[in-house]
């Protein structure tokens, strides 16, 4: 989830003295999960582990999932998406900066009524990308698989946005960028927020 080794440390004073946390561990104490950067196996596994941990800590308390991501691997992202749907706590999603490709699907997959974006953020939907080399028979297998994946992703977006499948298919044919207010009108998010008080607890 972190693209370089510079991770801020937070010093917290307790009755027993001072404790140092990296910033992401400190946010986790507040039930905040942060996806920063590309969706890949490593970042997805970290997010999944945090979601499962927070469910075990309190299955009735919301989780806040902040997303600033250009997207990435479909299989890794769908693992996060399925976990969001599987666990008991509502997962509130908040876009800060960019939620593109798989990032936009994770944003839309948050609990209904609890999907947010800051006003200057951008959201982008499109069809999955594929580039395969090898024998013709293998290319054919991969082509069929990516069409199945495309159909699955379109159905997920249709479910969460309320758009009909035909509209989703047309709108994801090419990169489709939206500002926060456009994403709200489309059904990818529920609220455009300018202050923390606007987030539903």
Swiss-Prot record:
Biological process, per Gene Ontology: protein quality control for misfolded or incompletely synthesized proteins
Signal peptide segment: none
Keywords: Cytoplasm, Hydrolase, Protease, Serine protease
Active site, UniProt feature: 101 (nucleophile), 126
Gene Ontology terms, MF aspect: ATP-dependent peptidase activity; ATPase binding; serine-type endopeptidase activity
Catalytic reactions on record: Hydrolysis of proteins to small peptides in the presence of ATP and magnesium. alpha-casein is the usual test substrate. In the absence of ATP, only oligopeptides shorter than five residues are hydrolyzed (such as succinyl-Leu-Tyr-|-NHMec, and Leu-Tyr-Leu-|-Tyr-Trp, in which cleavage of the -Tyr-|-Leu- and -Tyr-|-Trp bonds also occurs)
EC class (word): hydrolase
CDD domains: S14_ClpP_2
Pfam family, one: CLP_protease
Listed EC numbers: 3.4.21.92
Name the record gives this protein: ATP-dependent Clp protease proteolytic subunit
Taxonomic source organism: Francisella tularensis subsp. tularensis (strain SCHU S4 / Schu 4)
């Amino acid at each position: 989830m972190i693209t370089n080794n510079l991770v801020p440390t937070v010093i917290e004073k307790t009755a027993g003295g001072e404790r140092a946390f990296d910033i992401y561990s400190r946010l986790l104490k507040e039930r905040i999960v942060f996806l920063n950067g590309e969706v890949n196996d490593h970042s997805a596994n970290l997010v999944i582990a945090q979601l499962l941990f927070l469910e075990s800590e309190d299955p009735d308390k919301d989780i806040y999932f902040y997303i600033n991501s250009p997207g990435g691997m479909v299989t890794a992202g769908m693992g996060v998406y399925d976990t969001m749907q599987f666990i008991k706590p509502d997962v509130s999603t908040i876009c800060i900066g960019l939620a593109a490709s798989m990032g936009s699907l994770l944003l839309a997959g948050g609990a209904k009524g609890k999907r947010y974006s800051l006003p200057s953020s951008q959201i982008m939907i499109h069809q999955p990308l594929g580039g395969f080399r090898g024998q013709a028979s293998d290319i054919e297998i991969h082509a069929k698989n990516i069409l199945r994946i495309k159909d699955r992703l379109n159905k997920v977006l249709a479910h969460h946005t309320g758009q009909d499948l035909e509209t989703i298919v047309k709108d994801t044919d090419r990169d489709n960028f939206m500002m926060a207010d456009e994403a709200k009108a489309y059904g990818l998010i529920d609220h455009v927020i300018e202050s923390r008080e606007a987030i539903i607890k």
